């Protein structure tokens, strides 16, 4: 088959979903989100400098009501959360998931529409927060109408990502896909709690819900998204296999079941239920599990030596673009694996080879041996 010949890709259910070829991933949505995120990071960084200057010169821009500290700080916090961090995470999810699934993004138009709505949300936040319209809750300052727009945008994002995963070419899912799915589900729960449930109560209960939201905004939104990005790009950039996929999944489930309880540490020894403080004490030590597991993964896979001949082959084997996956055992000889071995190898590629995604070549472990795999447009 010619290198640039397009091949129809079938979904899990046998439904044609994409054409595997040089231009299988258009990445229009990715560019919109990432460019916007970088732009907001620079702008909000300037806001941070103005806020810092106010600590030294309290009267700096103090005569302008829109630039008072009480309005600038919520703008900085929410700008970094939604404009920079969450916008960048969404853009990277649009990049990673189609490549790990071997198909195009389910709907590029829906992705672009989500990006447009996201920018409308950021601009609305700027106008309302500087205008003094806010709820006065940490991380949940946005007025309710703007918060509703965030929910709508997140539903659009989640539908696009989950639909892409549902039409994936590969049955098994790499850990980055798990973390991104978790991010979508956990964000929905955390955001609804912090921005809407807090409005239904007052006093200590409201404070408890608010700190649950602020803490888990870091641990159940940005942490899993960051781990997904690291698990994808670090093995791919270093061209070495993931150390242990099961270990990464232990970290995933630890994050899922443990982290949500630890938000109460913001009110430790305060007027909250004793049982909540007790659970916090017992579970807090396990918060480090996902980070330690990820750190061990990304450290240990660098310790695996790759023979110089393997490195030379990695550099010399040309890219292929025909959508066909082939394998060559890198041993002392050039012997090819038997046909049955190739079939078993291809069945085992989905969970680990997807770590490197993209076109090029994948270095993985199979049956205790290093294997070089040609992979096109995955």
Language model region names:
Residues 26, 71-73, 307-310, 349:
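Helix-boundary and loop/linker segments of multi-pass membrane transporters
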Residues 19-35, 167-175:
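N-terminal juxtamembrane segment and adjoining first transmembrane helix
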Residues 169-174, 206-210, 237-248, 275-276, ...:
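Hydrophobic, small-residue-rich membrane helices and short re-entrant helix-turn-helix hairpins
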Residues 1-30, 61-64, 301-308:
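Extramembrane terminal tails and long inter-domain/linker segments of multi-pass membrane proteins
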Residues 299-311, 345-346, 373-378:
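Alpha-helical transmembrane segments
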Residues 30-56, 69-103, 108-132, 144-164, ...:
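Hydrophobic cores of alpha-helical transmembrane segments in multi-pass integral membrane proteins
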Residues 136-147, 172-176, 205-213, 272-283, ...:
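Non-cytosolic membrane-interface motifs at loop->transmembrane helix junctions
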């Amino acid at each position: 088959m010619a290198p640039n010949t397009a091949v129809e890709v079938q979904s899990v259910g046998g439904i044609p979903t994409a054409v595997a070829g040089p231009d299988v991933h258009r990445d229009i949505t990715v560019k919109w989100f990432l460019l916007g995120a970088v732009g907001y990071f620079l702008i909000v960084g300037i806001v941070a400098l103005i806020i810092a200057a106010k600590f030294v010169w309290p009267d700096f821009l103090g005569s302008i009501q829109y630039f008072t500290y009480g309005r600038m700080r919520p703008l900085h916090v929410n700008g970094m959360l939604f404009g920079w961090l969450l916008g960048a995470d969404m853009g990277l999810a649009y990049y990673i998931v189609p490549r790990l699934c071997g198909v195009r993004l389910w709907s590029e138009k829906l992705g672009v529409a989500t990006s447009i709505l996201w920018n409308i949300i950021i601009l609305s936040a700027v106008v309302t927060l500087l205008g003094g319209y806010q709820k006065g809750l940490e991380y949940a300052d946005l007025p309710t109408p703007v918060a509703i727009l965030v929910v709508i945008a997140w539903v659009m994002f989640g539908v696009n990502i989950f639909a892409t995963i549902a039409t994936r070419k590969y049955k098994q899912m790499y850990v980055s896909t798990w973390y991104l799915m978790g991010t979508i589900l956990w964000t929905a729960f955390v955001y609804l709690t912090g921005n809407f449930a807090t409005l239904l109560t007052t006093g200590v209960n409201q404070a408890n819900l608010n700190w649950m939201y602020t803490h888990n905004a870091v641990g159940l939104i940005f942490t899993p998204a960051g781990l997904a990005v690291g698990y994808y790009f670090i093995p791919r950039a270093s061209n070495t296999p993931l150390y242990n996929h099961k270990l990464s999944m232990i970290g995933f489930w630890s994050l899922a079941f443990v982290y949500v309880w630890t938000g109460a540490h913001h009110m430790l020894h305060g007027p909250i239920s004793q049982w909540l403080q007790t659970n916090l004490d017992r579970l807090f030590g396990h918060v480090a599990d996902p980070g330690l597991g990820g750190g061990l993964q990304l450290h240990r896979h660098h310790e695996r030596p790759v023979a110089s001949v393997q490195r030379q082959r990695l550099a010399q084997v040309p890219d292929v673009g025909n959508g066909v996956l082939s394998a060559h055992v890198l041993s002392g000889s050039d012997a090819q694996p038997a046909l049955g071995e190739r079939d078993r190898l291809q069945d085992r590629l989905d969970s680990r080879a997807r770590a490197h995604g993209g076109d090029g070549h994948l270095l993985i472990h199979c049956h205790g041996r290093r294997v070089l795999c040609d992979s096109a447009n995955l």
